[in-house]
């Protein structure tokens, strides 16, 4: 999104009536639009952006497309460098945690326990929604890798599984509440493979206010067998469509009452397999799905 002309050329390739997912906050915390949020400007998060959020939204709307903003929530080094209270602090209350030694390029991460971090994400959400985006697709709602020594220095908030989950859910629900005030909402994203390996820490549908979940599914990740609900499920020898028939009900179960939008890894499918998969999805009532 370096210029209005480049954006317009890209949008012309998309059929009218489709939905466009636009990455606006990427891993590392950089913004791909000129923000007016004080923390975004002061931290340098949008220093390389050229287009305003309204220019992006209006260009999408002019092509009769719906706009969804994709935001990397917590993988952010810009804002907690500017405001240290937005990052992880050690138990002493002022020393900040970095993901490596400073001389090796160590950087901070946004903490889900920080009021400042939550306020920053909600301010960005409000700015984006007010420009004309319909929904917020939330990614990177997770923690950096902590070594045992890190956990000791950071203390109970990151040691307790329940505290960890509640911190992530608080951030997501805050973004959703802000988006819903503008007539939209936030969508939770998680990998089915991660969820089955207990790595999707925020996946507690009863506590989540988000109405929809985008679930990343790569059938090729399930080559042998896996456990679910104390049952060993074998995937060996199954066709792509047979794998789909096994995995989709599990994904729906994990989503609870949230509306499931499956997102499949396109490179895992041959063309015929994708055609068959799309037909099966439609036959089974899945009108919203993605291959990417």
Regions found by a protein language model. Name each.
Residues 1, 37-50, 104-119, 157-164, ...:
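The substrate-binding groove and active-site-proximal loops of carbohydrate-active enzymes
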Residues 17-50, 152:
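Aromatic-lined carbohydrate-binding/catalytic grooves of carbohydrate-active enzymes
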Residues 34-42, 76-101, 144-159:
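Aromatic- and acidic-residue-enriched segments that line the glycan-binding/catalytic groove
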């Amino acid at each position: 999104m370096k210029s209005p002309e480049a954006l317009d050329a890209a949008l012309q390739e998309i059929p009218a009536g489709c939905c466009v997912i636009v990455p606006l906050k990427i891993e590392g915390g950089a913004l791909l639009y000129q923000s007016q949020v004080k923390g975004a400007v002061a931290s340098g998060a949008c220093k390389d952006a050229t287009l305003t959020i309204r220019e992006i939204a209006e260009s999408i709307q002019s092509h009769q497309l719906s706009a969804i903003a994709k935001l990397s929530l917590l993988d952010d080094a810009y804002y907690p460098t500017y405001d240290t209270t937005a990052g992880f602090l050690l138990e002493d209350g002022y020393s900040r945690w970095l993901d490596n030694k400073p001389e090796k390029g160590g950087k901070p991460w946004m903490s889900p326990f920080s009021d400042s971090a939550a306020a920053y994400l909600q301010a960005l959400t409000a700015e984006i929604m007010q420009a004309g985006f319909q929904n917020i697709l939330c990614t990177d709602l997770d923690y950096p890798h902590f070594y045992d020594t890190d956990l000791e220095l950071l203390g109970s908030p990151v040691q307790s599984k329940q505290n960890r989950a509640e911190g992530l859910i608080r951030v997501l629900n805050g973004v959703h509440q802000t988006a819903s005030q503008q007539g939209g909402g936030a969508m939770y994203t998680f990998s089915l493979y991660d969820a089955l390996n207990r790595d999707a820490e925020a996946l507690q549908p009863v506590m989540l206010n988000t109405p929809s979940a985008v679930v990343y599914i790569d059938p090729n990740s399930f080559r042998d067998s896996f456990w679910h609900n104390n049952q060993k499920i074998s995937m060996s020898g199954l066709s792509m469509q047979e794998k789909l028939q096994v995995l989709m009900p599990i994904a729906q179960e994990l989503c609870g009452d949230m509306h499931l939008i499956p997102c499949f890894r396109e490179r895992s499918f041959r063309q015929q397999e994708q055609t068959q998969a799309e037909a099966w999805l439609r036959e089974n009532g899945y009108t919203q799905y993605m291959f990417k």
